[in-house]
């Protein structure tokens, strides 16, 4: 769980910015959104398949783009 120590003389904005960075790095907000509603195993599996397909297509696109430069 993210937490910061506010140093003496620190402005609120600086401390808040550091806290936001930590929460973003630890994926707290995204995990919270994902757990907000129940997701069955089939839905999770579908999402994983879709993301895997997107990754493959992205790699193919980058590979073809790289090959066209040669």
Swiss-Prot record:
<dbReference type="GO" id="GO:1990904">
    <property type="term" value="C:ribonucleoprotein complex"/>
</dbReference>
<dbReference type="GO" id="GO:0006412">
    <property type="term" value="P:translation"/>
</dbReference>
<dbReference type="InterPro" id="IPR038380">
    <property type="entry name" value="Ribosomal_bS21_sf"/>
</dbReference>
<dbReference type="GO" id="GO:0003735">
    <property type="term" value="F:structural constituent of ribosome"/>
</dbReference>
<comment type="similarity">
    <text>Belongs to the bacterial ribosomal protein bS21 family.</text>
</comment>
<dbReference type="InterPro" id="IPR018278">
    <property type="entry name" value="Ribosomal_bS21_CS"/>
</dbReference>
<dbReference type="InterPro" id="IPR001911">
    <property type="entry name" value="Ribosomal_bS21"/>
</dbReference>
<keyword id="KW-0689">Ribosomal protein</keyword>
<dbReference type="Pfam" id="PF01165">
    <property type="entry name" value="Ribosomal_S21"/>
</dbReference>
<keyword id="KW-0687">Ribonucleoprotein</keyword>
<protein>
    <recommendedName>
        <fullName>Small ribosomal subunit protein bS21</fullName>
    </recommendedName>
</protein>
<dbReference type="GO" id="GO:0005840">
    <property type="term" value="C:ribosome"/>
</dbReference>
């Amino acid at each position: 769980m993210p937490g910061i120590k506010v140093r003496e003389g620190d402005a609120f904005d600086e401390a808040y910015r550091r806290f936001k960075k930590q929460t973003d790095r630890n994926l707290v907000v995204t995990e919270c959104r994902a757990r907000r509603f129940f997701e069955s195993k089939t839905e999770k599996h579908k999402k994983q398949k879709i993301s895997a397909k997107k990754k493959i297509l992205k790699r193919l696109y980058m590979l073809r783009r790289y090959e066209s430069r040669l």
